[in-house]
Amino acid sequence: MPKHEFSVDMTCGGCAEAVSRVLNKLGGVKYDIDLPNKKVCIESEHSMDTLLATLKKTGKTVSYLGLE
């Protein structure tokens, strides 16, 4: 399963919780949230576009960094 890395402008635990919420709702993902470095690594069969759109639902600035 591909691992995608995203930069997400998270500043606190609440931001990380919002990311967890939208990813859990999407389903079919395994993820790691690196709050200090503002990165989210997602292992999923979903397309990068789907994952990016899902992360943007948090209202945070999100950018795709590439495959890990």
From Swiss-Prot:
Pfam families: HMA. It comes from the Eukaryota. The modification N6-acetyllysine is found at residue 60. The keyword Transport applies. Ubiquitous. Keywords: Acetylation, Chaperone, Copper, Copper transport, Ion transport, Metal-binding, Phosphoprotein, Transport. The modification Phosphoserine is found at residue 47. GO terms for biological process: copper ion export; copper ion transport; intracellular copper ion homeostasis; negative regulation of apoptotic process; response to oxidative stress. Cu cation binds at residues 12, 15. GO terms for cellular component: cytosol. Changing residue 22 to A: Has no overall effect on Cu(+)-bridged heterodimer formation with ATP7A. The keyword Acetylation applies. InterPro entries: Copper_transport_ATOX1-like (IPR051881), Heavy-metal-associated_CS (IPR017969), HMA_dom (IPR006121), HMA_dom_sf (IPR036163). Changing residue 58 to A: Has no overall effect on Cu(+)-bridged heterodimer formation with ATP7A. GO terms for molecular function: ATPase binding; copper chaperone activity; copper ion binding; copper-dependent protein binding; cuprous ion binding; metallochaperone activity. Residues 1-63 form the HMA domain. CDD domains: HMA. Binds and deliver cytosolic copper to the copper ATPase proteins. May be important in cellular antioxidant defense. Homodimer. Interacts with ATP7B. Interacts with ATP7A. Interacts (via dimer form) with SLC31A1 (via C-terminal domain); this interaction improves ATOX1 stability and controls intracellular Cu(I) levels. The heavy-metal-associated domain (HMA) coordinates a Cu(+) ion via the cysteine residues within the CXXC motif. The transfer of Cu(+) ion from ATOX1 to ATP7A involves the formation of a three-coordinate Cu(+)-bridged heterodimer where the metal is shared between the two metal binding sites of ATOX1 and ATP7A. The Cu(+) ion appears to switch between two coordination modes, forming two links with one protein and one with the other. Cisplatin, a chemotherapeutic drug, can bind the CXXC motif and hinder the release of Cu(+) ion. Belongs to the ATX1 family. This is Copper transport protein ATOX1. It comes from Homo sapiens (Human).
